[in-house]
Swiss-Prot record:
Gene from which the chain derives: flgI
GO biological process assignments: bacterial-type flagellum-dependent cell motility
Organism: Albidiferax ferrireducens (strain ATCC BAA-621 / DSM 15236 / T118)
Name this protein carries in UniProt: Flagellar P-ring protein
Assembly information from the UniProt record: The basal body constitutes a major portion of the flagellar organelle and consists of four rings (L,P,S, and M) mounted on a central rod.
Lineage: Bacteria, Pseudomonadati, Pseudomonadota, Betaproteobacteria, Burkholderiales
Signal peptide start-end: 1-33
Family in the record: Belongs to the FlgI family.
Role noted for this protein: Assembles around the rod to form the L-ring and probably protects the motor/basal body from shearing forces during rotation.
Compartment(s): Periplasm; Bacterial flagellum basal body
Keyword tags: Bacterial flagellum, Periplasm, Signal
Length: 381
């Protein structure tokens, strides 16, 4: 896919050249061969998400305000009880722990992970801690969706940020309420993977496409013999594989390296309505159409009006009122004819000829699609 940011009217030339260059470079790879492992994955071989509630200690006065976050004090009390330290209930509610923060710990348990293997963990503040920088995560069990503990996390946080505050002023760089611990969790339990079950394995395409499914099945049949693979639908391919573990692993390794010609993706335009960015692939074409687009602006200004009583009046008060002025300005839109465009560079050039802002282009593309002149699927995210 080719990416481009829509153009501001005052700087069309350099961006148009860059877009054409990207289109030519990426468009040259439409027939480039790819491996099966890059378009499909073996069903059942996947990572599993782990989560856990933990505490970060050792903060420099930037932890939770425990009077507002009672679960921080409760979590610390439960942890101390495991160490044989019991606090009176009357004291728990009075704890002022500025160097402790309640956090949510997440990790991805990779496929085939074995006990003792280290995995990375992400740590995010759950309360009102100002910063987790310099903190240490105490032992936190990480559980899967079934409620079983699969890993234990602990270690010093790496927070890619900095901040300082004094005299009512505050400066902050990056995010201080989240961090990461490389290799901070140790796997304690194996997740069974059904790789050796049955007489066949199932490949799942990353994107549903009948053409790609057919090509994957044909590539496997050419290498391992007819009827070794069959496409079940636009995403699933059933492959007959050896039953012995070593032979099956070797079979999968060789199968994933098989080359296949990449099919041309279906034409698609993706619009991000929040950022104003637009992404389209090289299959997008544009039919001949005419567009008129005018800008409409509404400006509201408020002017304070002071009303004072007469000099000799009694009981009068000075009143400040506001007078609002509303102006609506609509700029005329010139009708522009867009020619038929069969290449991405031509589509980019035609859209840039409108001189529209990114937000305007969002509406223009939707209108072109509604008129039947945009030969692509339009997706708004």
């Amino acid at each position: 896919m080719q990416f481009f940011n829509t153009l501001h009217p005052t700087r069309p030339h350099w961006l148009l050249a860059a877009l054409c260059l990207i289109a030519s470079l990426l468009g040259a790879g439409t027939a480039q061969a790819s491996r099966i492992k890059e378009v499909a994955a073996v069903e059942g071989v996947r990572s599993n998400q782990l989560t856990g509630f933990g505490l970060v200690v050792g903060l420099d006065g930037t932890g939770d305000q425990t009077t507002q976050m009672p679960y921080t004090a409760q979590g610390l009390t439960n942890y101390l009880q495991q160490l044989g330290i019991t606090l009176p209930e009357a004291q728990v509610s009075k704890l002022q722990l500025k160097n402790v923060a309640a956090v949510l710990v997440t990790a991805a348990l990779p496929a085939f992970a074995r006990p003792g293997q280290a995995i990375d963990v992400n740590v995010s503040s759950m309360g009102n801690a100002k910063s987790l920088k310099g903190g240490t995560l105490i032992t936190t069990p990480l559980k899967g969706a079934d409620g079983e503990v699969y890993a234990l996390a602990q270690g010093s946080l790496v927070v890619a940020g900095a901040g300082a505050a004094a005299g009512g002023s505050k400066v902050q760089i990056n995010h201080l309420s989240a961090g990461r611990i490389p290799g901070g969790a140790q796997v304690e339990r194996i997740v069974p993977t059904p790789l050796l079950e049955g007489a066949s394995i199932t490949l799942g395409l990353q994107a549903s496409d009948f053409q790609t499914a057919r090509r994957v099945a044909e590539a496997i049949n050419r290498r391992f013999g007819a009827h070794s693979a069959r496409a079940l639908d636009g995403r699933t391919i059933d492959v007959t594989a050896p039953s012995e573990s070593n032979a099956r692993v070797s079979f999968i390794a060789e199968m994933e390296e098989l080359q296949l010609e990449s099919s041309i993706p279906s034409a698609k335009v993706v619009i991000n309505s929040r950022t104003g960015s637009i992404v389209m692939n090289q299959a997008v074409t544009l039919g001949e159409c005419a567009i008129a687009h005018g800008n409409l602006s509404v400006s509201i200004s408020t002017t304070p009006v002071i009303s004072q009583p007469n000099p000799l009046s009694t009981g009068g008060k000075t009143v400040v009122a506001e007078k609002s002025n509303i102006q609506i300005r609509q700029e005329p839109g010139m009708l522009i004819q867009l020619p038929k465009s069969t290449q991405l560079s031509d589509v980019v050039r035609a859209l840039n000829a409108l001189g529209a802002t990114p937000q305007d282009l969002l509406a223009i593309l939707q209108a072109i699609k509604a008129a039947g002149a945009l030969n692509a699927e339009l997706e708004v995210i």
